[in-house]
């Protein structure tokens, strides 16, 4: 399965422990370095509904929820309302310790950083995962030799979406092209378009 989570309780429980470890690290770091800002890096792939069909729109919305599952917990300090539906879908029950909710709330991250390489389209027939995204083609975009779309609008879309969601600083830490790197004017033009 391309979905790293599937119905494996061990994976889901490990993800919860990752959230707790991150929050505890943030709490400790603030004691040691009160002015420090801590964050995490997320692979953030912009996506569009494959068509305007309502079922494609619903599939797209579900995938956006999956995309933000990790950052919602780590930047907001609590599980989003849709988390329980994921757990039900995968037939898992997360075991939480008595003070886990307080730890998550106290240890929220200060910024969102992300990598962004390609956009995709999401349709009703695509297999949705927590980690893996389908690689749907967008007929409105040119592609690299690897078949990755060149989509400078998507970086703006992600910046707006993430800021609207968290109202915290954002850092773009990777914005690749998806082909063999070699200095040429085409790469510079694509970079300029993204800026």
Regions from the PLM with identified roles:
Residues 1-192:
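Active-site region of glycoside hydrolase catalytic domains
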């Amino acid at each position: 399965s391309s979905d790293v989570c599937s119905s494996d309780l061990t994976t889901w429980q490990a993800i919860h422990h990752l959230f707790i470890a991150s929050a505890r690290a943030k709490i400790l770091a603030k004691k040691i370095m009160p002015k420090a800002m801590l964050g995490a890096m997320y692979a953030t792939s912009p996506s569009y509904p494959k068509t305007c069909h309502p079922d494609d729109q619903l599939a797209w919305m579900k995938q956006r929820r999956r995309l933000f599952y990790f950052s919602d917990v780590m930047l907001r300090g609590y599980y989003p309302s849709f988390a329980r539906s994921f757990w039900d879908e995968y037939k898992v029950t997360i075991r939480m310790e008595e003070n886990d909710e307080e730890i998550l709330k106290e240890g929220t991250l200060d910024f969102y950083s992300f990598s962004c390489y390609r956009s995709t389209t999401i349709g009703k027939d695509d297999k949705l995962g927590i980690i893996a995204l389908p690689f749907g083609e967008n007929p409105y975009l040119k592609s690299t030799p690897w078949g990755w779309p060149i989509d400078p609008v998507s970086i703006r879309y992600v910046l707006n979406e993430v800021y609207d969601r968290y109202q915290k600083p954002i850092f773009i830490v990777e914005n690749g092209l998806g082909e063999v790197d070699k200095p040429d004017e085409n790469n510079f033009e694509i970079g300029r378009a993204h800026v």
